[in-house]
Amino acid sequence: MLKVFLVEDEFVIREGIKNNIDWKAHGYEFCGEAGDGELAYPMIQRLRPDIVITDIRMPFMDGL
């Protein structure tokens, strides 16, 4: 299973993406989430996801 990590500063959008996709049915494991790039960076280094879904414009550190 590929591990997916989500980075999105808008809580409603983040929850919508996280909760409305049947990750396991599509062969993915949802391994974590963060509200901005600064919080996400150490988590991504620790969790080593295969895929990162990220917003581009976020406070502190953008998705690029």
Language-model features: locations:
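Active-site residues of response regulator receiver
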Residues: D55
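Two-component/phosphorelay signaling modules centered on CheY-like receiver
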Residues: E10-C31
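Non-catalytic signal-transmission and effector/linker regions of two-component phosphorelay proteins
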Residues: M1-K3
